[in-house]
């Protein structure tokens, strides 16, 4: 699993926190950030440079001939697919944690309200005697 990341020397893909991708001249720059350890000020990161793929395509206009376009390297595309799987999984786990915490807060509120209601009913019973 994550063969493309492993081919970059990333032995433990589960340590990946996020990534960024930018274009510089004729290259795409991929920067992968790892989870910070306790006491670290900055997250550890690695940077990779991919040359952009050049293609010659037919121009849109009549009689225009051909034009050269640049696009992302196929290898980089595969790496990004794997990174998206990892980063999306992390977001899903965070969203699930947030949902569970919200559910707990709601349950706490409902139980507190019900306890107050029962105590009020008990108070009414003791006043009527």
From Swiss-Prot:
InterPro entries: UPF0325 (IPR020911). Disulfide bonds: none annotated. Belongs to the UPF0325 family. NCBIfam families: PRK13677.1 (NF010213). This is UPF0325 protein Ent638_0703. It comes from Enterobacter sp. (strain 638).
């Amino acid at each position: 699993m994550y063969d493309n990341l492993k081919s970059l020397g990333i032995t433990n893909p589960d340590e990946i926190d996020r990534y960024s991708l930018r274009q510089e001249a004729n290259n795409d720059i991929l920067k992968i950030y790892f989870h910070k350890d306790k006491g670290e000020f900055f997250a550890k990161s690695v940077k990779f440079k991919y040359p952009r793929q050049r293609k010659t395509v037919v121009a849109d206009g009549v009689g225009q001939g051909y034009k050269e376009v640049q696009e992302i390297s196929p290898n980089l595309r595969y790496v990004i697919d794997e990174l998206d799987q990892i980063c999306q999984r992390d977001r899903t786990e965070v969203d699930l944690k947030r949902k569970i915490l919200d559910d707990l807060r709601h349950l706490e509120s409902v139980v507190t309200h019900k306890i107050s209601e029962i105590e009020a009913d008990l108070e009414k019973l003791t006043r009527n005697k």
